[in-house]
A protein has these predicted regions:
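N-terminal hydrophobic/helix-forming segments and targeting peptides
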Residues: 1-208
Length: 208
C-alpha cells in the first residue's frame, strides 16, 4: 500500500494530475463517469464518478437494497505550493526569476534549496478549437535559494517571508536561457504561440 501511495504521489505533481489519476483508478474499479450537464440515470448497485474543471472529483456508490444512512469521506486533491503568474519571467541582474504567488497555507521555508519543477494545465489552440492539456516537466528547472547567514543574521529568529522579495524561484542566467514558456511548450508537445492560458504550479522533485 505504501508503494502504491508513493507511486500516486509521484504521478500527481499538480491537482489536475491527481484528479486524472483518481478518475482512472475509479474507472478501473468499475465506476461510471457522469457529466454534470447530462441527465443522470442512477441505478441501484451503481458506482459513479463526477469531475469538475479537472480539479475536483466526487465518487459515490448506490447500495442494492436502499439504505438508512450514508458515509462521506473527503480529502484535498491540491496542496500548498506556488502558482506561476502570467508572463512570469523577471530579469534580476544577470539572472531570470519567475513571478509567483503563494497558493494555500504553506511552511514557506521548506521550499528553499530544493530541486523544483513545474506542472499543471495549459489552455491551447488546437485545430481552431480550445483544448486542455496537462503538463509536467520531468526535470529540475528551478530553485528558491536561501542566503548565507552573514547576509541575513535574523534568519533563525522569528523569520517572516515576503514572496515577492525572498521566494521568487531562480530560473537561470538571463543570457542564452531558453524562454520559460518554450520549455513548457516543448514538454507538452505544443507550440508556445498556441498556449493561450495556463494554471502552472511548482512541485518538489524530492521523492515522496
Amino acid at each position: 500500500m505504501s508503494r502504491d501511495l508513493l507511486h500516486f504521489i509521484a504521478k500527481s505533481p499538480s491537482v489536475f494530475h491527481a484528479v486524472r489519476g483518481v478518475k482512472a483508478a475509479l474507472a478501473y474499479a468499475g465506476f461510471t463517469e457522469l457529466r454534470e450537464e447530462d441527465t443522470w440515470q442512477i441505478e441501484k448497485g451503481g458506482k459513479y464518478v463526477v469531475t469538475r474543471d479537472g480539479s475536483a472529483l466526487v465518487a459515490f456508490a448506490v447500495p442494492e437494497n436502499g439504505g438508512e444512512f450514508f458515509r462521506i469521506a473527503a480529502a484535498h486533491c491540491d496542496s500548498p505550493t506556488f502558482k506561476i503568474k502570467e508572463n512570469p519571467e523577471i530579469k534580476d541582474g544577470p539572472y531570470v526569476r519567475l513571478n509567483v504567488e503563494g497558493y494555500g497555507g504553506m511552511i514557506m521555508s521548506t521550499w528553499m534549496d530544493r530541486p523544483l519543477s513545474v506542472a499543471g494545465r495549459l489552455i491551447t489552440r488546437e485545430n481552431g478549437h480550445l483544448a486542455q492539456k496537462l503538463v509536467a516537466v520531468d526535470g529540475t528547472m528551478l530553485v528558491i535559494p536561501s542566503v548565507a547567514i552573514h547576509m541575513d543574521r535574523q534568519v533563525n529568529q522569528n523569520k517572516s517571508w515576503n514572496v515577492q522579495k525572498d521566494l521568487l524561484p531562480l530560473y537561470g542566467l538571463s543570457s542564452g536561457k531558453t524562454p520559460f514558456m518554450d520549455v513548457i511548450a516543448a514538454s507538452a508537445k505544443v507550440k508556445a504561440e498556441d498556449i493561450l492560458a495556463h494554471d502552472l504550479y511548482l512541485y518538489s522533485r524530492v521523492p515522496g
